[in-house]
Amino acid sequence: MEFLHRLGGESSREWAMRVVLQNIIHLVLPPGTSLSDKEIASFLSLSRTPVREALVLLEEMRFVDVYPQKGTFVSLLDVDDIEEGRYIRKCLESDTLIQACRSFSADGAIALEANLKMQQNALDTGDRKRFLFLDQDFHRLICSGCGRERVWSVISKNSLHFFRVRRLKIKGGGVGQGYFHEQHGELLEAILAHETDRALDILNRHLTWDVETVRASYPDYFTRDSMSKKMYMFMSEVAPVVAGAL
């Protein structure tokens, strides 16, 4: 697990939650990974109580599953969660792009151009994690450049499951980071040229790709088609008991 320094004013629970969540969405802790509150507490030099509280919150957010008698695990990817995150992002970003094409600040354009150069540097050096950060920040800068930075806060908080599978897609080598970088450049051109329809088309292509292709490459990372992992594990516990009673 990767260590993240504690932020000023951050409680022990908040810090533990941020560390575990970042490791989950960046796939340092892949879907299905066993989690130990004792080991996490030792890693962060915390007591187990705030770590347990953090895991409870992550379970509510559907990033962690707790199974009695079995343990705590990183949640498998659920297509419904992914599609919900994609939907939220497409709806809010599309509306923001319309505004950006109408009016975009000069400082915002400069910031996007600088971001694109840093993305290229990350590509050249093979720094995938850095590229993903800059990718997210590019979209935040679009929101900021048209006066809607708080919209990005809503998007980012509600599309983390989508981000996790997008990270997996890049890791798997399906659609490369160069492809996303190229689309970012096209988005900036469309915004500066006030070409709303073109910008919306680019965004649609940027966010729309088949989750099933990722699932085919990493089937063990996803929930089953008609039965979640939690139900599967529950049945694996119950079935022997029922069979023994017959």
Which residue ranges define each predicted feature?
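Short alpha-helical transmembrane interface motifs in multi-pass membrane proteins
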Residues: 78-79, 166-170
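Conserved amphipathic alpha-helical segments that form helical-bundle/coiled-coil interaction surfaces
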Residues: 85, 106-168, 181-193, 197-209
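Anionic, Ser/Thr-rich low-complexity intrinsically disordered regions
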Residues: 25, 177-180
